[in-house]
Amino acid sequence: MIVKVKTLTGKEISVELKESDLVYHIKELLEEKEGIPPSQQRLIFQGKQIDDKLTVTDAHLVEGMQLHLVLTLRGGN
């Protein structure tokens, strides 16, 4: 299945998934395409963060749906 991920800049990234894939796998694919480490990624659907440990099925992700990618930046002084 194909799921779309939209960044804060408005860029839309399509990722191909299997129902048994973990949500974390989406972050790995985004790292390959965009160079953003998974530890800095948060995937949001309907205003809630999706747990990395869930499978695509358990997270209720379906073909064509759109997730939002939010980056968490490490704070400094």
From Swiss-Prot:
Gene3D superfamilies (alphabetical): Phosphatidylinositol 3-kinase Catalytic Subunit, Chain A, domain 1 (3.10.20.90)
A Gene Ontology cellular-component term: cytoplasm
Pfam families the record matches: ubiquitin
Stored InterPro entries: Nedd8-like (IPR038738), Ubiquitin-like_dom (IPR000626), Ubiquitin-like_domsf (IPR029071), Ubiquitin_CS (IPR019954), Ubiquitin_dom (IPR019956), Ubiquitin_ubiquitin-like (IPR050158)
SMART domains assigned: UBQ
Residues in cross-link Glycyl lysine isopeptide (Gly-Lys) (interchain with K-? in acceptor proteins): G76
Any one GO molecular-function label of the UniProt entry: ubiquitin protein ligase binding
Keyword Secreted listed: no
Domain Ubiquitin-like intervals: 1-74
A GO biological-process term: regulation of proteolysis
Keyword annotations: Isopeptide bond, Ubl conjugation pathway
Propeptide segment residues: 77
Subunit (UniProt): Interacts with CDC53 and DCN1.
Functional note: Ubiquitin-like protein modifier that can be covalently attached to lysine residues of target proteins. Activated by the dimeric UBA3-ULA1 E1 enzyme and conjugated by the E2 UBC12 to substrate proteins. RUB1-conjugated (neddylated) substrate proteins include the cullins CDC53, RTT101 and CUL3, and the modification enhances the ubiquitin-ligase activity of the corresponding cullin-RING-based E3 ubiquitin-protein ligase complexes (CRLs).
Note: Present with 1310 molecules/cell in log phase SD medium.
Protein name: NEDD8-like protein RUB1
Species assigned in the record: Saccharomyces cerevisiae (strain ATCC 204508 / S288c)
Gene, per the UniProt record: RUB1
